[in-house]
Amino acid sequence: MRVTDFSFELPESLIAHYPQPERSRCRLLSLEGPTGALTHGTFTDLLDKLNPGDLLVFNNTRVIPARLFGRKASGGKIEVLVERMLDDKRILAHIRASKAPKPGTELLLGDDESIHATMTARHGALFEVEFNDPRPVLDILNAIGHMPLPQYIDRPDEDADRELYQTVYSEKPGAVAAPTAGLHFDEPLLAALREKGVEMAFVTLHVGAGTFQPVRVDTIEDHIMHSEYAEVPQEVVDAVLAAKARGNRVIAVGTTSVRSLESAAQAAKSDLIEPFFGDTQIFIYPGYQYKVIDALITNFHLPESTLIMLVSAFAGYQHTMNAYKTAVEQKYRFFSYGDAMFITYNPQAISERP
């Protein structure tokens, strides 16, 4: 399959630069997987679409202020984007500089350049950085870091983004991008869903900067997926198996929840799904056999991205591309701060190719 098969025209004006004032008031495009039928509504329509006993699976990762600015002690300006925290002193990061720093390079970080760090090793495209500071890494990032808004939002981060670019249920710091489908859930909607009898479970996948990297090959089968850390604990496994046993649906909130659950299913030796704690490089594209997910809540993704490929594998290529064409025509808002989709599984998707 060609990467260009997953391209579509998107006017710049449809890229959302700010979220809706009220999280759950975004628009919702519903796609019926088996038929391709589309319906238009608002996000709170989920209350009518979900049944008592259905299981929503959320990703409870929390975005860290992962973008740092500063300079090398020798003078050149740098921008650091944390990929992951290795421990209380070290990070793995992307570094933008006119000349890549060598091991041993001293870095001065923060607006006042008061934080001292050393680039200690290089791992492919990533740099290992150790802070020379008594505080834990997370405290340093909270003090001097900027929220790592995606490039397409195309504005400096603001103080408000520290909360707006987090889900209301975020709990475990470690992501450099929000699991954006979850941004639409507010406390009143969560309470209403619970009252209806909708079950909830929480996985953790720390979204890495690789999620924004373009696919740089022509044929998608040649793409090497970036690695991200995921946790699917026993209580999530139990909730999934219980929902399946009683004939209810498992609904993933966002592609990161999909990738977590499907990673746990792939690694399972005897049951449908088993606990999973580790790095995943799962790459889902048309032809993939979904094992766990019955429905998906997700935002609108970038052209030619691995995420639109994941959606195509779930809903079917033609249904997905038609939905995106309709969304553009109907002026839905796209990407991280944009509108959402509710998609049910298309069993024919596995045999469909572009």
Curated annotation (Swiss-Prot):
HAMAP family: QueA (MF_00113). Transfers and isomerizes the ribose moiety from AdoMet to the 7-aminomethyl group of 7-deazaguanine (preQ1-tRNA) to give epoxyqueuosine (oQ-tRNA). GO terms for molecular function: S-adenosylmethionine:tRNA ribosyltransferase-isomerase activity. The gene is queA. InterPro entries: QueA, QueA_dom1, QueA_dom2, QueA_sf. Monomer. It comes from the Bacteria. This is S-adenosylmethionine:tRNA ribosyltransferase-isomerase. One of its GO terms (cellular component) is cytoplasm. It is found in: Cytoplasm. Keywords: Cytoplasm, Queuosine biosynthesis, S-adenosyl-L-methionine, Transferase. One of its GO terms (biological process) is tRNA wobble guanine modification. It comes from Salmonella choleraesuis (strain SC-B67). Its EC number is 2.4.99.17. Belongs to the QueA family. It holds the Pfam family Queuosine_synth. SUPFAM superfamilies: QueA-like (SSF111337). Its main location: cytoplasm. Pathway: tRNA modification; tRNA-queuosine biosynthesis. Coiled coil: none annotated. It catalyses: 7-aminomethyl-7-carbaguanosine(34) in tRNA + S-adenosyl-L-methionine = epoxyqueuosine(34) in tRNA + adenine + L-methionine + 2 H(+).
